[in-house]
Amino acid sequence: MRGGLWQLGQSITRRLGQSDKKTIARRCYASEADLKKTVLYDFHVANGGKMVPFAGWSMPIQYKDSIMESTINCRENGSLFDVSHMCGLSLKGKDCVPFLEKLVVADVAGLRPGTGSLTVFTNEKGGAIDDSVITKVTDDHIYLVVNAGCRDKDLAHIEEHMKAFKAKGGDVSWHIYDERSLLALQGPLAGSTLQHLTKEDLSKMYFGDFRIIDINGSKCFLTRTGYTGEDGFEISVPSENAVDLAKAILEKSEGKVRLTGLGARDSLRLEAGLCLYGNDMEQHITPVEAGLTWAIGKRRRAEGGFLGADVILKQIADGPAIRRVGLFSTGPPARSHSEIQNEKGENIGEVTSGGFSPCLKKNIGMGYVKSGLHKPGTKLKIVIRGKTYEGSVTKMPFVPTKYYKPA
C-alpha cells in the first residue's frame, strides 16, 4: 500500500534485526548533501535516529530500539513515524470528483464527505502508477497522499491530465501541501494517546474517516488510517508545529508510544499484507493482479471511465494470468526477485517482498504466481542464492489487522 518505501524496502527487510545500515545508504543516494530533510530531522538525530537516504530524503531507519523491538512495540503499544517525505495535496472545484475518477479506480463520487479509501492511479494499459489513500473532504474538495518515491511522476501525471480537463471547461485546481508535515501514530494506544491532545471525540471516528480539527493547538488534517495493520492516524500538521506535536504525543503516552523508523514500518506493512509500490506493485501490474479488485467500486466496474479500464474490467471478468499471494518459506528469508517454482522445479513466479516476521517468528513474503497456483496451501519452492527451499502459499494478512470500525 503506502509509505513510499520504494527503493528501501528490499534492503530494510534483508537486514531486519541487524545493525549494518551502510549498504542501505549506498543503494539509494550517493551524497548526503543532496538529500532533503524533514522539519523533524534534528529531533530524530537528538533521539538517536539512524539516518539513511531514502527517495531523496534523509530519514530514520530506526532509533535506539532494534527493528524487531520496534515492530513488536507497535503491535503491543504504539509507534510514531515521521512520514513527511510523502506528498499531500488537495484537488478542489465542482468537477474535482469526475476529474479524479478519470485517473483512479475508486468510486470517489460514492464516498461520503469525511470518508476515504485506498485507490490506485492507473495508466492506459491498466498498470499501477501508484497507490494512494484519497479522502472526500466535501463534494468539491478531495485530499490525498501519494508515495515519496512516486511524487514527481504522480504530480506530472495529474498535472498533464488536469490541463487537458480544464481546457475542456472542467473546474478543478490543486494545492500541494509542502508547508505541512505528516506524522503517523499507529498501534493500540493511538486513540487514547491522541485523545489527550484534542477535544474532538475520536471514539466516533472510524477507520477511513477524515476530520479537520485542532490537535495540540494546531489545525490538523486527521485521517484514521495507516500502513501497519493497526489502528492509528495520519496527522497533517503545519510544519512549524510538527516537532511540538511529536513531543506531545510521546509525552502523553508516558513512554509507551515510541519513535519508530522505516525499518519497522516495512516489517509491519509486510506482516499486514500491504503492498509496497516499486516491489509488490509496478506500472506493469494491474490492481486485479495485485489483489486489489475490492478497491474498484461496483459502479466503476459497470461504467469504467478510468485509464486502462478495458484491460482491468476484462481481467475481472476472465481472471488475471498472475496473482499476488502470501508466502511462507523455510531457510533464509526470501528476497525480491527470488524465483518461485512448482514442486517439479518449473518457474511459476517471483517473490516481490520478503523478510523475517518479528511477530510470527518465521519467514514471510509476497510474490506473484500463475493463476491456479495461488490457492492457500499450495506447495512450492523458492530459490535463494542458488539454493532451493520449501515454501507454500498462505492467506494474508499474516498478522490480523485491528482497524477501528463500528461494532
Curated annotation (Swiss-Prot):
Catalytic EC class: transferase
GO CC annotation terms, alphabetical: glycine cleavage complex; mitochondrion
Keyword Transferase (UniProt): yes
GO BP terms, alphabetized: glycine catabolic process
An MF annotation (GO) of this entry: transaminase activity
Presequence positions on this chain: 1-29
Regions annotated as coiled coil: none
Residues holding substrate: E234, R265, Y403
Database matches in Pfam families: GCV_T, GCV_T_C
Principal localisation: mitochondrion
Catalytic activity: N(6)-[(R)-S(8)-aminomethyldihydrolipoyl]-L-lysyl-[protein] + (6S)-5,6,7,8-tetrahydrofolate = N(6)-[(R)-dihydrolipoyl]-L-lysyl-[protein] + (6R)-5,10-methylene-5,6,7,8-tetrahydrofolate + NH4(+)
Catalytic activity, EC: 2.1.2.10
Keyword entries, A-Z: Aminotransferase, Mitochondrion, Transferase, Transit peptide
Location in the cell: Mitochondrion
Record InterPro entries: GCS_T (IPR006223), GCST_C (IPR013977), GCV_T_N (IPR006222), GcvT/YgfZ/DmdA (IPR028896), GcvT/YgfZ_C (IPR029043), TrmE/GcvT_dom1 (IPR027266)
Family listed: Belongs to the GcvT family.
Described function: The glycine cleavage system catalyzes the degradation of glycine.
Subunit structure: The glycine cleavage system is composed of four proteins: P, T, L and H.
Descriptive protein name: Aminomethyltransferase, mitochondrial
Species for this entry: Flaveria pringlei
